[in-house]
């Protein structure tokens, strides 16, 4: 784990979206919800959601088609094979979302968003690609509420797009070039208080990950079953290895396979986003809301700084493979995932680590 800053000297003195593409979260009747995709030019796609129901609907925009960040919005395939995603994975506290995280649609109203799918996927091969979106749209209990109490399952139409590979390559290369430049940010982002907070966050991450590794390998089988829906010895050992890799990464602030930034060096932060991981280079950036979280939570399953670091590093392919997705957030939603989904969902790991370390 590299921390980009003058923090390296400090560490030596001191000693680390919503993509809800699943069908097992609490669902509501999806009658009246319509999502249509259309091609607007080479790799640009427009999504339109329409509420054809009789009541207003408030849904979460984060990690969906209507998130302005480079999160996974659609599924892309070519010749039957999925095209890998290369964007960002963000962490949000699903139980503490700001009002601007939601959009409200009155009956008959529509909302649209346009994005470039080449920003988060390498489509330079060109030719015919299939593009679609499906999953669950998290919804609020009532209009104007910020409490998520369910989700509406949706499935868009499927597009077949003939893509100019050279033009797609330019879009993707531009994004990758930006990431490359950012990886050489100087030591200004982690000075002072922010730097000390990150040092302490990494220490907390080590504690969580080490406890979770022990719990996964040799701990209570029922506790493991609660979070990962299996007690397979092979699966338990593999989960333990992931936690061991995270513990090692968080214990090495001056070396390692990832970099933590104390500021939003990529410009993806928005209110409600706590931190994010850039898939392409396993960089973790913290947002202002990260510093509003408690440094340490000793009871329950709420997020703190170490919790978030564990969550983000499960996304980092340089730390452990396969990397995780953001299928669901928070205990109530994560508990409804099946075994395969749970093992691939970042927050299940943070929740398990918190449960073991805090005795929750």
Curated annotation (Swiss-Prot):
Name the residues that bind Zn(2+): 311, 315, 326
- Propiece residue ranges: 20-182
Q: Which cysteines are joined by disulfide bonds?
A: 190-262, 269-287
Pfam families from the xrefs? Peptidase_M35
The top EC class is hydrolase
Q: Which GO terms describe its molecular function?
A: metal ion binding; metalloendopeptidase activity
Q: How is the cofactor bound?
A: Binds 1 zinc ion per subunit.
SUPFAM superfamilies referenced in this protein's UniProt entry, alphabetically: Metalloproteases ('zincins'), catalytic domain
Active-site residues (renumbered): 312
Q: Which reaction does it catalyse?
A: Preferential cleavage of bonds with hydrophobic residues in P1'. Also 3-Asn-|-Gln-4 and 8-Gly-|-Ser-9 bonds in insulin B chain
Could you mention a single GO BP entry for this protein?
proteolysis
- Where is it found, in Gene Ontology cellular component terms? extracellular region
**Keyword RNA-binding found:** no
InterPro entries in UniProt: Fungal_M35_metalloproteases, MetalloPept_cat_dom_sf, Peptidase_M35
Catalytic activity, EC = 3.4.24.39
Does the record carry Metal-binding as a key word? yes
Q: Which residues form the signal peptide?
A: 1-19
Gene3D superfamilies associated with the record: 2.60.40.2970, Collagenase (Catalytic Domain)
Tell me where in or outside the cell this protein is found. Secreted
Any idea which UniProt keywords this protein has? Cleavage on pair of basic residues, Disulfide bond, Hydrolase, Metal-binding, Metalloprotease, Protease, Secreted, Signal, Zinc, Zymogen
Cofactors that this protein relies on: Zn(2+)
Database matches in PANTHER family = NEUTRAL PROTEASE 2-RELATED, PTHR37016
Q: Please give the family membership noted in the entry.
A: Belongs to the peptidase M35 family.
Q: What does this protein do?
A: Secreted metalloproteinase that allows assimilation of proteinaceous substrates. Shows high activities on basic nuclear substrates such as histone and protamine.
Q: What is this protein called?
A: Neutral protease 2 homolog UREG_01255
- Taxon lineage: Eukaryota, Fungi, Dikarya, Ascomycota, Pezizomycotina
